[in-house]
């Protein structure tokens, strides 16, 4: 009951602030009918949901099964985008592990497995569900630094994989977001955050 009150207050305040879209929060109901009812009441639609892929540490069939389940949920919600982040060997959220110099670095074979897997998932999402796969580069993951984003974008099919451009993660890596955004035209979503300046 308390979780429901927190969730309802959160989406109510979003609506009052003028927002008409939301990503799927981790406290949102897992039942699409229940979630849709709560959001429709407030005029809010789902625009995206995080998907944790494990393309270099799990069998592709297992990743695909989890991916399809999430696509079914998003399709029921009327969403058009799914945001994937490769979580194999991720140190994201490990507060005692520095993300610079201590995160996992893929070898060439793992890069091929990862990029081919993203293309495969993106094709499923687009052709079978009408949903676009966008990739979220993230601190502590195998695609964190600008050169890793560049390699991922260069080795995936733009028809099936786009970039979720995150200003905060680029800034944290020492990159200038305005310069980085000029490099990529294949963007589906943008996360705007500034980790170095007080609000």
Identify the function of each model-found stretch.
Residues 1-3, 7-81, 108-119, 158, ...:
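N-terminal pre-domain/capping segments
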Residues 2-6, 190, 194-199:
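Single conserved hydrophobic/aromatic residue that forms the stacking wall/gate
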Residues 20, 167, 195-196:
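Ser/Thr-centric signal marking residues that sit
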């Amino acid at each position: 009951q308390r979780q429901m009150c927190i969730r309802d207050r959160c989406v109510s305040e979003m609506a009052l602030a003028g927002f008409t879209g939301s990503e799927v929060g981790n406290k949102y109901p897992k039942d699409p009918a229940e979630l849709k009812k709560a959001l429709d009441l407030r005029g809010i639609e789902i625009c995206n949901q995080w998907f944790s892929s494990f393309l270099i540490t799990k069998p592709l069939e297992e990743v695909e099964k989890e991916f399809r389940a999430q696509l079914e949920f998003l399709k029921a919600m009327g969403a058009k985008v799914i945001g994937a982040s490769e979580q194999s060997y991720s140190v994201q959220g490990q507060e005692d592990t520095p993300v610079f110099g201590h995160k996992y670095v893929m070898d060439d074979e793992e890069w091929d497995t990862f990029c081919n897997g993203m293309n495969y998932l993106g094709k499923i999402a687009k052709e079978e569900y009408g949903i676009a796969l966008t990739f979220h580069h993230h601190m502590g993951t195998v695609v964190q630094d600008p050169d890793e984003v560049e390699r991922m974008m260069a080795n995936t099919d733009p028809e099936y994989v786009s970039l979720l451009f995150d200003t905060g993660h680029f800034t944290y890596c020492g990159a200038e977001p305005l310069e980085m955004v000029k490099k990529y035209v294949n963007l589906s979503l943008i996360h705007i955050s500034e980790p170095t300046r007080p609000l």
